[in-house]
A protein has these predicted regions:
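C-terminal amphipathic/interface module of NAD(P)-dependent oxidoreductases
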Residues: 171-189, 460-496
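Mid/C-terminal beta-alpha module of Rossmann-like enzyme folds, strongest
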Residues: 181-190, 404-457, 490, 496
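N-terminal Rossmann NAD(P)H-binding glycine-rich loop of SDR-like oxidoreductase domains
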Residues: 189-211
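NAD(P)H-binding glycine-rich loop region in Rossmannoid oxidoreductase-like domains
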Residues: 223-280
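Conserved Rossmann-fold NAD(P)-dependent oxidoreductase catalytic core, especially the SDR/UDP-sugar
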Residues: 269, 281-326
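Conserved beta-loop-beta element that borders a ligand/cofactor-binding pocket
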Residues: 301, 337-360
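Glycine-rich "substrate-gating" loop/helix at the edge of Rossmann-like oxidoreductase active sites
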Residues: 323-328, 353-361, 381-391
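Alpha-helical substrate-binding/gating segment
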Residues: 340, 368-376, 384-425
Length: 496
């Protein structure tokens, strides 16, 4: 005779293990839901479901729910079924699930249906008993279920806080868009964006659409990108999908593989070059073949163009500062040179040398994590310069360069602009300010040696720096909303 109650608990244990995989691999890993701007409602549902599963795992691990408690259990099952169906609807409305996540969710739903049906059979018998939570230990199985309950409860808290942060961020961005809208040029244009699904690209596309521009995004996964943008932009996997009859007025080139990560082996260097120089060359070749050329190319670059500035050197680096013979500088030089070749086709080119971009996504959350845990401190000597920019100022600066170039009506030319705030500071000062904004201590330094051992030459991005100034932006009349690190971090870190 099969013990249906024991079988139900075993299926619950499988649910806990598979749910942990789904949370860690998909929600926190590949999909990064806590950092996805459109995932607030999904995370709120996850938080509610996690609290239900926490109660079920712990409550059924060692107790039988007799009498009125059996009816409570049946009601909880009903609520969970409704929330599961709602979760499916919200997920499909906000993002394109990868195949592995969709399969995992299907298996979880089938398994949940099985153990809920089996436990409902037990509950009908429990309902006839006097009302009580009856101790009924299940040995190691019960201990595992209780552990699953603790884990899913913590996951629910994580999702609840993340959902709250996303809702607040959305409200803040809405208020900012209403009170200080970003204007790109004097009239609606047709814009092609590469790298439009990245941290900066997503924000740029939203601002372009809000300003009335028709946006096309060139991306590797057009279907997923179109889903993520809610169908308001055209997404293509190949430039050949843009008909010759469809004019493009402005191109914004932000594409490029992530710099920080694996060591810079020869293979990795080739990937970084191909994703920047190679892609930009493809873009310029496409421009050359167009019957009507775009009039402006805004192309990404980085302050790594200037190489490494000795820590004892406090001189400011403007756009005319020379590059160096190190890989990061050479990468930026080749990237910019590929973009500048568009001038030969009558296109204005602006190379945007980005500093460390501060935003709710990107590298800042990882940088702030040890500080928020009370374990922040200087990195290496802490004397290296950190040139940064708030992401909202970066978007505004793009709009400014666009507008000023449109006004100039001069022959096609190429210029470089430093996209950094005027308030560059040393890394230890930045960390101290971040700890102050987060109300945390700043006491635990990270020595340079293990960082260099782990990353090799790439460690220069963290342990060395440049004191870069936005000379051309300031000379052309641009004004930063967040000129100093404290105002930028306060805007990004404090709840609204």
């Amino acid at each position: 005779v099969i013990d249906t109650h024991l079988l139900a608990l075993q299926l619950m244990a499988a649910q806990g293990a598979l749910g942990a995989f789904d949370t860690l691999y998909h929600h926190e890993g590949t999909e990064a839901l806590p950092r996805r701007g459109t995932a607030g409602r999904e995370l709120a549902i996850h938080a509610t479901r996690s609290s239900i599963y926490c109660a079920l795992f712990i409550g059924l691990s060692s107790w039988a729910w007799h009498g009125a408690w059996a009816w409570v259990l049946l009601v909880v099952f009903g609520v969970e079924i409704v929330l599961t169906l709602w979760d499916f609807v919200v997920e499909d409305g906000s993002r394109l699930l990868p195949p592995t996540e969709r399969v995992t969710h299907t298996v979880l739903a089938i398994n949940a249906g099985a153990f809920i049906a089996l436990l409902a059979m037990s509950a009908t018998g429990w309902a006839a008993q006097p009302t009580a939570m009856v101790w009924q230990p299940q040995g190691w199985l019960g201990a595992f279920l209780a552990l699953c309950g603790v884990g899913v409860g913590l996951s629910g808290l994580r999702d609840a806080f993340a959902a709250r942060a996303l809702f607040r961020r959305s409200a803040q961005e809405h208020v900012r868009a209403v009170e200080a809208p970003v204007r790109f040029g004097s009239r609606p244009q047709r814009v092609l964006v590469t790298g439009g699904t990245g941290f900066i690209g997503q924000l740029l596309v939203r601002h372009l659409v809000a300003d009335g521009h028709a946006v096309t995004v060139w991306t590797r996964d057009a279907r997923s990108a179109a889903w993520g943008f809610g169908g308001v932009v055209r997404c293509v996997q190949s430039l050949d999908r843009i008909p010759a009859a469809d004019d493009v007025d402005v191109v914004v080139n932000l594409a490029g593989a992530r710099i920080l990560g694996m060591r810079w082996s020869e293979r990795r260097r080739a990937q970084l070059l191909q994703s920047r120089e190679g892609l930009t060359q493809q873009l310029v070749a496409w421009i050359a073949a167009r019957p009507r050329k775009p009039w402006l190319l805004l192309s990404g670059s980085a302050i790594g163009y200037y190489g490494v500035q000795p820590q004892g050197d406090a001189s400011e680096l403007a756009e005319d500062a020379p590059p160096q013979a190190v890989f990061m500088s050479q990468l930026c030089q080749r990237w910019e040179q590929a973009a500048r070749s568009a001038v030969a086709h009558g296109v204005h080119v602006a190379c945007m040398r980005f500093g460390f971009v501060l935003g709710h996504q990107g590298s800042l959350p990882q940088l702030l994590l040890p500080i928020s845990l009370g374990m922040g401190g200087r990195l290496g000597s802490g004397r290296q310069w950190l040139s940064w920019v708030h992401v909202h100022d970066l978007i505004r600066a793009m709009a400014h360069v666009w507008t000023e170039t449109e006004k100039a009506a001069s022959p096609a030319a190429a210029q470089a602009f430093n996209f950094t705030a005027p308030g560059a500071l040393r890394q230890e000062d930045f960390t101290r300010i971040a700890a102050s904004v987060l109300h945390r201590p700043c006491w635990m330094p990270t020595p340079a040696a293990p960082v260099r051992l782990l990353l090799g030459e790439q460690a220069d991005l963290l342990l060395e720096g440049q004191r870069v100034v936005p000379a051309r932006l300031l000379q052309s009349g641009f004004r930063f909303m967040f000129p100093d690190a404290r105002s930028a971090l306060t805007d990004l870190c404090r709840p609204r």
